[in-house]
Amino acid sequence: MVTKKARRDMDSTIPSSFHLAGCEWVVMMVPELPDMGLCNPSTYEIHIRDGMNEQATVATFFHELVHAVKFTMGETGHDEKEVEGFGNLLCQWYKTRQKL
């Protein structure tokens, strides 16, 4: 059985929840998740595989955040190359912003 837990103990980069267009999205760390991350627009949940290193976890969060934004905008067919590139740029921006 896969258990899910709300993200509480990871770096503050990753929120436990956030809002897009009036909907609350919940971020959960999921042990043994087959993929690194998953974005579910039906339940407004982002699942991230628990146990990855911080760099992989943060990059996965930003990748899944891009999916959440695209779903919120009504886009259902996501180009993974575009999502990965945009997610990596957001992650880089966030890390650079923290150092300023």
Where are these regions (language model features)?
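Short, flexible active-site-adjacent loop segments at beta-strand->alpha-helix junctions, enriched
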Residues: 24, 52, 89
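Post-HExxH zinc-binding segment in Zn-dependent metallohydrolases
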Residues: 73-100
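Short Lys/Arg-rich cationic patches that frequently serve as NLS/NoLS or arginine-rich RNA/DNA-binding motifs
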Residues: 1-8
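Catalytic zinc-binding patch centered on the HExxH motif and its immediate surroundings
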Residues: 10-47
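Low-complexity, intrinsically disordered short peptide segments enriched in small/polar/basic residues
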Residues: 24-27, 63, 80
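Short pre-active-site segment immediately N-terminal to the catalytic Zn-binding motif
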Residues: 41-61, 75
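Active-site recognition of the HExxH zinc-binding catalytic motif
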Residues: 59-71
